[in-house]
C-alpha cells in the first residue's frame, strides 16, 4: 500500500515537472518570440533612424545650399544697392555738370549775341539769320547826312571769292572787313545752335529786306 502511494506521488511529481517544463518551454518560446519581435522592431527602428539621418543630411545639404544662395543673393543685393547709390551720385554730379554747362552755354550765347549786336551796329550790317549757315544774306547800311545807302548781299557760305570781293567792296566804304567777317562767323555759329532763336533785323534794315542779291556791276556797288 505504501509502495503504491509512493509510485503515485512520484508520478505526480514527474507529471508536475513535465508540466512545469512544458510551461517553461512555452514561456521561453513566448520570450523568444517577444525578443525576436523586439529585435525586428529594433532593426526597423535602426533602419528608420538611418533613413531619418539620411533625410536630415539631405535637408542640411539643401539648407546649406539655400543659405549659400541667400548669402549670394544678399551680397548681390548689397552690391546692387551700392551700385545704384553710386549711379545716383554720378547722376547728381552729371546733373550739376549739365547745369553748369547750360549756364556756360547761356553765358556764351549771350556774349555771342551781344557781340553780334555790337558788330551789327558797328558795321551797319544786318544779317538774315534764317538763311545761315548755307547762305550769307543781309544788307549793310551806309549812313549819310542826306540819305542812307543800302548794300544788299546774298552769297553762298562756301563762296570764298565772292565773300572776299564783298569785303573789299565794303572796305571802300570804310567798313571794317575784319569786324564784318567776325559778325558773319558769330552769326553762323549761332545759326548752327538748334536752341538759338534768330534775331530780328533792326528797323533800319526793313527797307532792304526785299533786296536779296548784290549787283557788283552797279555804280554804287562797284569795287
Swiss-Prot record:
GO biological process: cell division; meiotic metaphase chromosome alignment; meiotic spindle organization; mitotic metaphase chromosome alignment
Coiled-coil parts of chain: 65-115
One GO cellular component term: nucleus
Localization per Swiss-Prot or TrEMBL: Nucleus; Chromosome, Centromere, Kinetochore
Keywords: Cell cycle, Cell division, Centromere, Chromosome, Coiled coil, Kinetochore, Meiosis, Mitosis, Nucleus
Metal-binding listed as a keyword: no
Family note: Belongs to the SPC25 family.
Role description: Acts as a component of the essential kinetochore-associated Ndc80 complex, which is required for chromosome segregation and spindle checkpoint activity during meiosis and mitosis. Required for kinetochore integrity and the organization of stable microtubule binding sites in the outer plate of the kinetochore. Participates in SAC signaling that responds specifically to disruptions in spindle microtubule dynamics. The NDC80 complex synergistically enhances the affinity of the SKA1 complex for microtubules and may allow the NDC80 complex to track depolymerizing microtubules.
Assembly: Component of the Ndc80 complex, which is composed of Ndc80, Nuf2 and Spc25.
Protein name: Kinetochore protein Spc25
Organism of derivation: Drosophila lutescens
Lineage, highest ranks first: Eukaryota, Metazoa, Ecdysozoa, Arthropoda, Hexapoda
Gene assigned in the entry: Spc25
Amino acid at each position: 500500500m505504501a509502495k503504491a502511494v509512493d509510485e503515485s506521488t512520484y508520478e505526480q511529481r514527474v507529471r508536475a515537472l513535465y508540466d512545469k517544463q512544458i510551461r517553461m518551454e512555452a514561456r521561453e518560446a513566448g520570450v523568444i518570440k517577444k525578443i525576436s519581435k523586439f529585435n525586428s522592431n529594433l532593426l526597423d527602428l535602426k533602419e528608420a533612424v538611418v533613413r531619418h539621418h539620411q533625410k536630415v543630411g539631405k535637408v542640411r545639404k539643401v539648407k546649406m545650399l539655400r543659405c549659400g544662395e541667400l548669402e549670394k543673393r544678399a551680397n548681390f543685393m548689397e552690391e546692387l544697392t551700392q551700385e545704384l547709390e553710386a549711379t545716383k551720385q554720378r547722376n547728381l554730379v552729371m546733373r550739376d555738370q549739365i547745369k553748369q554747362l547750360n549756364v556756360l552755354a547761356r553765358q556764351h550765347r549771350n556774349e555771342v549775341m551781344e557781340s553780334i549786336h555790337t558788330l551789327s551796329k558797328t558795321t551797319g550790317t544786318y544779317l538774315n539769320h534764317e538763311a545761315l549757315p548755307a547762305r550769307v544774306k543781309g544788307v549793310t547800311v551806309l549812313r549819310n547826312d542826306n540819305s542812307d545807302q543800302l548794300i544788299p548781299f546774298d552769297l553762298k557760305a562756301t563762296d570764298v571769292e565772292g565773300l572776299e570781293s564783298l569785303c573789299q567792296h565794303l572796305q571802300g566804304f570804310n567798313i571794317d572787313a575784319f569786324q564784318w567777317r567776325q559778325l558773319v562767323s558769330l552769326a553762323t555759329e549761332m545759326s548752327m545752335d538748334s536752341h538759338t532763336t534768330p534775331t530780328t533785323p533792326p528797323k533800319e534794315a526793313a527797307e532792304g529786306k526785299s533786296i536779296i542779291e548784290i549787283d557788283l556791276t552797279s555804280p554804287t556797288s562797284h569795287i
